[in-house]
From Swiss-Prot:
<keyword id="KW-0067">ATP-binding</keyword>
<comment type="similarity">
    <text>Belongs to the UPF0200 family.</text>
</comment>
<feature type="binding site">
    <location>
        <begin position="7"/>
        <end position="14"/>
    </location>
    <ligand>
        <name>ATP</name>
    </ligand>
</feature>
<protein>
    <recommendedName>
        <fullName>UPF0200 protein TON_1344</fullName>
    </recommendedName>
</protein>
<dbReference type="InterPro" id="IPR027417">
    <property type="entry name" value="P-loop_NTPase"/>
</dbReference>
<dbReference type="Pfam" id="PF13207">
    <property type="entry name" value="AAA_17"/>
</dbReference>
<dbReference type="InterPro" id="IPR022970">
    <property type="entry name" value="NTP_hydrolase-rel"/>
</dbReference>
<keyword id="KW-0547">Nucleotide-binding</keyword>
<dbReference type="GO" id="GO:0005524">
    <property type="term" value="F:ATP binding"/>
</dbReference>
Amino acid sequence: MIIIVTGMPGSGKSKIVKEFEKRGVPSVSMGDVVREETAKRGLELTKENVAKVSIRLRQELGQNAVAKLAVEKVRELLRKNKVVVIDGVRSLDEVGTFRSAFPGEEIIIVAVHTPPHMRFERLKARGRHDDPQSWEDFEERDWKELKFGIGNVIAMADYMIVNDCPKEEYERRVQELVEKILAEH
């Protein structure tokens, strides 16, 4: 089984991924795939370079470029595990790539929704090199994500979790969701 976790930047995807990992489920991060490709191209890991490589990959390999690069990582993990989580799928083309590459696997999409103002504050506090420091940067990044088609993936989710609450409550919601998914599938 493949569990795709999607949501806008700063929505809380990593909490879900970490909860699966605590239960022994390995993961592949689509963002890490892009960052690895950025480094392979000899570029410094800045938000500008990562964004450019993300766009360039899609120009070179199609809208499902990052998924194509991630398929082998997922395949390797599925050889040893019954369940693999993919973090950060951004388009239905990418979902389709995984469906085509793994026709015998059940694929479940989990989406996280968090209000924009909460995501902005979390991203500023997170401090990763590609996180926005101004509202304008934040909005620009959101528009890029939406242009990739992330909204369509969110709309097709099998499970939706809302992260509009204190951290402890969200963690409880995540634990319940992960337990439910693993029990039902």
